[in-house]
Curated annotation (Swiss-Prot):
Key word tRNA-binding present: no
The name this protein goes by in its record: Phosphoribosyl-AMP cyclohydrolase
Domain of life of the source: Archaea
GO biological process: L-histidine biosynthetic process
Source organism of the structure: Methanococcoides burtonii (strain DSM 6242 / NBRC 107633 / OCM 468 / ACE-M)
Family: Belongs to the PRA-CH family.
Cysteines engaged in disulfide bonds, as pairs: none
Length: 121
């Protein structure tokens, strides 16, 4: 395993993390991880991230049930970004869409809504 000390966390101790569907390759979300989130992810096999707005560790799907089972972690060539190859339960986006990338640049909805946030949160 790569020594986590060799990863390039930013000045706030964070590293960018992309969640990607293990089967289809679809990009589902972008978030940040601190070292603790990465360690918890490795330890449990369930994606954990760092919430910049709440300033706390969060287990993806903890309140919604829409967890991310991690199959593989990939580190980029600069050691400053991570891809999590995951199986997504339910939707990845808190707005109800399967992917957080559900709009194109024109503002058109191009993604699939898979749950109603009012029923979950």
């Amino acid at each position: 395993m790569i020594d986590l000390d060799t990863l390039k966390f930013d000045g706030n101790g964070l590293i960018g993390a992309i969640a990607q569907d293990n089967r289809t390759g679809e990009v589902l979300m972008f978030a940040f991880m601190n070292r603790e989130a990465l360690e918890k992810t490795i330890e449990t096999g369930i994606a954990h991230y760092w919430s910049r707005s709440r300033q706390k560790l969060w287990k993806k799907g903890e309140s919604s049930g829409h967890m991310q089972k991690v199959h593989e972690l990939l580190i980029d060539c600069d050691m400053d970004a991570i891809i999590l190859k995951i199986s997504q339960e339910g939707g990845a986006c808190h707005t109800g869409y399967r992917s957080c990338f559900y709009r194109n640049i024109e503002g058109d909805v191009v993604g699939e809504k898979v749950f109603d946030p009012a029923d979950v949160y």
